[in-house]
């Protein structure tokens, strides 16, 4: 199952756009950032059409909350209807019973096989921890979109103590694809289920044709990065027959899949498409990925998102700047920090121009089109330095930054 540099589109090649953690609806009532999430979700759908993919696979947290507003529903439904409902022919076949994998009460088959709607580019999605199922009927926002024929919600978990992961099986020419999904389960509960042997992954039945090969693609939405006090699902807990795993939940975007030397599976931490915190991982480039699969070979192409609001972060240790830690020096410290923020704003604007350089070169964009950036200056002020109130300081940059109340973060070194 080697990764190759490129696979040509063709009758034997699955082309799949991978995305996760879109968090549609995040800060939707903010006057500056309110449209960010659905603007980027629309860009992702545009990319899928431009790349002529067979399907989109989404790894959880499509919505930021499990009870989205009418505004969030409207923008997602509009985008899916504009992009997924089309005359593009479906070039693959579903060769398994989808009812177990989709586990819905109604319409237990993918939308592209419903004669009442014309789906040409389906989206397959699992629930994350933000848009998980709740209520008496355990309904997720994805169930609403699924029953409307706008996406396919799969990987549902009905009983956290007894989980069976059943794949959707597809065929395209000489290539066979098994698509697995496991929606977000609290780590402690999932680890207990694993330890008791009650998590089962069903493999495709090859008894009728022992020579048939399946490319096994898995979507999961769990903690992946070790942090103090945080439980994670280890990659080695997943079955060894998996070929590729789209790992949702973590927002840091890694530019390529990494092979696990024990299981042999390639793990892609695709990251979020919008910054939901002012943390270092959110400053990385935001990408979606086109996964091409032919037989057991695959290639993964990152595509940078251009609509993402630029985010620049910087750390300053005042004791290393040469500034004196005296009360009479407060003005000089303030001016130094203001200068740092102004430089960061300039850097953010350059990042936007670089990411959208073709539009600038073609005259489709100008300087005024650059969005207000996200800026976070982390200042370590141990040693007796006097600094301005963080909110007062941040409000100096109204009209220049998007996060007008939390530009600066002061902290002291732990002893």
Briefly describe each language-model feature range.
Residues 1-110, 211:
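N-terminal active-site segment of His-dependent metallophosphoesterases
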Residues 10, 117, 212, 333, ...:
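Solvent-exposed loop and beta-edge segments used for protein-protein assembly and interaction
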Residues 16, 179, 374-375:
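Conserved hydrophobic helix-helix packing surfaces used for dimerization/oligomerization
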Residues 18, 58, 125, 218, ...:
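Structural beta-sheet core signal
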Residues 50, 210, 239, 369-371:
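Alpha-helix termination/capping residues and helix-transition junctions
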Residues 55, 67-292:
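His/Asp/Glu-rich metal-coordinating catalytic cores
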Residues 282-285, 290-308:
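Active-site C-terminal subdomain of aminotransferase-like
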Residues 299-415:
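Accessory, non-catalytic peripheral segments of nucleic-acid enzymes
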